[in-house]
Amino acid sequence: MKITLKTRRILRWLLAGSLFLLTTLSLTPWQPALAQDPEPPPPQSVDPATLEADLEPLPAWSSPIGTTENPEALVTIDPATGLNIILPPAPPAAESASVSQMMDTFVQLATGEERAFGSLTVVPNPEDWPDRTAVKMWSEYPSGATTVCTGILIDSSVVLTAGHCVYTWEASRCTGGATKCWADKITVAPGWENNNSPYGWVESFAVSGDFIVWNGWINSKDYDYDMALVKLDFPIGALTGWFGYGPNSDSWYIGRLFHSTGYPAAPPYDGSDMYTWQGSYDTIEEFALVHENMGYGGQSGSGTYYWNTATDQYFVQGVHSHTRTYYSPPKDEVGNTRITTSKFTSIYDRIQDHTPDIYDLVPMDINTDSSTYNRGDILGSMNYYVFNHASVSKSKTVSVSVYLSSNDTISIFDTLLSTHQFTWNFPANGGVRVTVSPGDLPRIPYNLVSTDSDEDFWIGVILNVSDSDTSDNAVRDQDAKKLTINHTIFI
């Protein structure tokens, strides 16, 4: 049994024993989609809308620099030493393809057959399935430079993207005379649109071993291996869903319709909106899927995928990697680094390794009937989602504490409003939306606001369970619900 607990996470609360009332809750399987002790400081999470990012140019293809022994190997940073390490070889995968997980009502994409990829078109509702599985990425490097790319969720907590979005060969982004280096931090935001992240964002760090890149890219800048995994320590895919992925034979690609969704940021685009295009590949190569279009910076890492209309499943086939320009005759091409059988096996193995094999319940997405209340009000309704981030199912009676905080970090040092329980059989990588029953809805305290003006507070929950990772049993800052409490008392 191997479970990785993130040591960098802030321990925001301690488990305290309490007597909880047994109550009946309305449970609906979600269709995806004040103490004397000081409170710990809130996490230093940075809203990506505030980042000043440079364009990540879509690189032009070039020959590999020398040769690399074992280019199929995966490389990450050893958190203990800070040095690159090659991960052990992956065993044979248990499946021939990984299936997508839809977490909400299905939204159909255009299905008109085309001989080649058409023009980019703006996605009108990027917060909807299936487009919200695409994430905008900000990569921050040792020099302080920040660049933007795209990625695709292929698990509740794993993003697939281009290797050059994670490990750069641009010396200007590195320090200490290095000519190539890892990004220090990567921030991802699903369904991003015009500085709005409807599902919040997640940060990952190189020093925690969150980034995995193919050895062929790291040592030879080989575009056949321009692919990377970004592991997330929050399963944001529980709110958005995720795509499957898998390899196929050369002949399988002929005549089929494919899609690619991302965030072009080079003129005439500015990276603020999600765009998509669709069509058939013009050339099928051993390590690349190629179509005759001009690519744009910011699209790097976009997943190119196939929609199986018979099963309503989506399968990522590769990632947007590089451009190729020809002058006789003149044409531009986009090369997508292909998921080969070997790459699929490695991806599958690393996702399994990243997923706990003991249940891990994570609360998220707090909703209330209003965002403004008076002192003494009882909430009209409240619900939240609980996700089991694990490879195993778990039947569990869960005791829950509801807190009100003066900031968005929910802890046991905040004001306890109410408690309740629910029982559910959690599937692996699945969850339930909990609707608090009327008799257990929390009341806003009468003595909460001491000033002569309205004040902002945040409401959230803590799950009182001893699962595989107790650091995520409190709702995270972005999922706590902000409330405005009127200072006037209405009786």
Name each model feature, range by range.
Residues 355-491:
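Extracellular/luminal regions of secreted and cell-surface proteins that mediate adhesion/ECM remodeling
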Residues 194-197, 204-208, 212, 223-298:
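Chymotrypsin/trypsin-fold serine protease catalytic domain
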Residues 109-132, 138-148, 154, 173-238:
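Conserved catalytic-core segment of clan PA serine endopeptidases
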Residues 158-163, 254-266, 287-293, 300-329:
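Active-site-proximal beta-strands of protease catalytic cores
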Residues 21-32:
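C-terminal segment of classical bacterial N-terminal signal peptides
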